[in-house]
């Protein structure tokens, strides 16, 4: 999802997963199941630099080998570039909710075909046309240093022998 003060990653305002199937996103958001939304906005507060990457891969294990394979070439080609961490933040917030701050917003997805198809919209109050939208915690803040330290610590843990085949 991409909400106010954020931008999309597939169109100027739509996030890929919602844009691909906004109808499914809308059904899910309106389903009443407990949801904490981790939008692009919070992920764009991450800043995976070459220095952080080098710290991650100091220890050899299957996870760091995968990181070397997937990110190593990117940092070799563009060492000055940084990368956002998306799914990793969503998962980390399940492990330690204090890594993120949230704001309660009503969230809906535009399903009208046009230039704003698949765009998620959030507001503190319900608005005309969004009847049925649910209020949910939406992640806005990220303690980047605590997050990346936890991430590095976790990926450097030894894996059980059964998973090292």
Please identify what each model-predicted range represents.
Residues 1-13:
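Class I SAM-dependent methyltransferase SAM-binding "motif I" and its flanking Rossmann-like core
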Residues 16-23, 30, 35-165:
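Conformational coupling and interaction surfaces
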């Amino acid at each position: 999802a991409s909400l106010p003060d954020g931008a999309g990653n597939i169109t100027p305002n739509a996030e890929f997963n919602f844009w691909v199937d906004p109808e499914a996103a809308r059904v899910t958001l309106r389903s009443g199941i407990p949801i904490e939304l981790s939008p692009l906005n919070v992920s764009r507060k991450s800043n995976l630099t070459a220095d952080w990457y080098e710290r991650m891969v100091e220890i050899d294990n299957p996870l760091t080998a995968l990181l070397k394979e997937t990110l190593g070439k990117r940092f070799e080609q563009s060492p000055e570039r940084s990368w956002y961490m998306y799914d990793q933040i969503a998962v980390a917030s399940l492990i330690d909710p204090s890594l993120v701050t949230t704001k309660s917003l009503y969230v809906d997805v535009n399903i009208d075909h046009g230039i704003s198809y698949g765009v998620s919209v959030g507001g503190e109050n319900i608005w005309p046309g969004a009847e049925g939208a649910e209020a949910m915690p939406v992640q806005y803040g990220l303690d980047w240093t605590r997050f990346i330290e936890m991430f590095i610590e976790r990926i450097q843990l030894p894996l059980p022998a059964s998973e090292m085949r």
